[in-house]
């Protein structure tokens, strides 16, 4: 079903069954598969392929040569009807690839709202990207990676399968990340190591001085003491009772399966 207000270039191919919403623009030489649903106000500029069971929300901007919802690269994948779900107001730049999920990984690659994926970035099967994240040029996420809100991944970085990156993390360019990265941390290197709290990013997002002070203290407990994480966790839980932003640390450590960067 194609909304009457949608604008589709004569050279674009929209397969029968696709749902094209109000005021959608589909530019030259795009290919839209039969199981694709594109929401109100989304713009596909040109030469874009959207395939599989793919849902794209409202007011997204998608640039040339992006590939969304294509079959993933997991060797176990055998054409099962898995999905790609994308929220609203995302900017997906040139040559970005976003692959559909796998049955073993939950069946969905899921992206939230207000994200920016720069040129040549790759999002593999079963990834979960929440809101307001940035992938710089050539950043690569392996399968099953999760990015919490406000994560910035520097250019040419790569994140290992199943890694979780906490909210407000900033990863420097060229980082190789093989373990979970706690919230609020800056990290860089091969393999990535922590080098402080993302203070400037937190200030821009309205964190007040007492909260920043509490986050710094927790960072010092984790990274600048001789105690193990199990030993410092009760202390962090006490701080979290007084400051809800610290509860991110507690929740993160309890769900971590790969261990945290050191």
UniProtKB/Swiss-Prot annotation:
GO CC annotation: cytoplasm; membrane
EC number: 2.3.1.129
Keywords tagged on the record: Acyltransferase, Cytoplasm, Lipid A biosynthesis, Lipid biosynthesis, Lipid metabolism, Repeat, Transferase
Keyword Repeat: yes
HAMAP family: LpxA
Subunit (UniProt): Homotrimer.
Function: Involved in the biosynthesis of lipid A, a phosphorylated glycolipid that anchors the lipopolysaccharide to the outer membrane of the cell.
The protein's name: Acyl-[acyl-carrier-protein]--UDP-N-acetylglucosamine O-acyltransferase
Organism from which the protein derives: Mannheimia succiniciproducens (strain KCTC 0769BP / MBEL55E)
């Amino acid at each position: 079903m194609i909304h009457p207000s949608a604008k589709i270039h004569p050279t674009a191919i929209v397969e029968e069954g696709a749902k094209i919403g109000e005021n959608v623009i589909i530019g030259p030489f795009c290919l839209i598969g039969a199981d694709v649903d594109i929401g109100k106000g989304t713009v596909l500029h040109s030469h874009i392929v959207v395939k599989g069971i793919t849902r794209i929300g409202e007011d997204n901007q998608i640039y040339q040569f992006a590939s969304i919802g294509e079959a993933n690269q997991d060797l176990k994948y055998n054409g099962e009807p898995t999905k790609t779900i994308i929220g609203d107001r995302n900017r997906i730049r040139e040559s970005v690839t976003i692959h559909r999920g796998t049955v073993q990984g939950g069946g969905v690659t899921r992206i939230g709202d207000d994200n920016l994926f720069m040129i040549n970035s790759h999002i593999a099967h079963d990834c979960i990207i929440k809101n307001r994240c940035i992938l710089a040029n050539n950043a690569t996420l392996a399968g099953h990676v999760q990015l919490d809100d406000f994560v910035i991944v520097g250019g040419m970085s790569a994140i290992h399968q199943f890694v979780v990156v906490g909210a407000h993390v900033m990863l420097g360019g060229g980082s190789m990340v093989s373990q979970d990265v706690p919230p609020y941390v800056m990290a860089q290197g091969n393999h990535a190591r922590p080098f402080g709290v993302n203070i400037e990013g937190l200030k821009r997002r309205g964190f007040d001085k007492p909260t920043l002070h509490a986050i710094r203290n927790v960072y010092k407990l984790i990274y600048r003491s001789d105690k193990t994480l199990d030993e410092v966790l009760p202390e962090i839980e006490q701080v979290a009772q007084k400051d809800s932003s610290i509860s991110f640390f507690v929740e993160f450590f309890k769900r971590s399966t790969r261990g945290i960067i050191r």
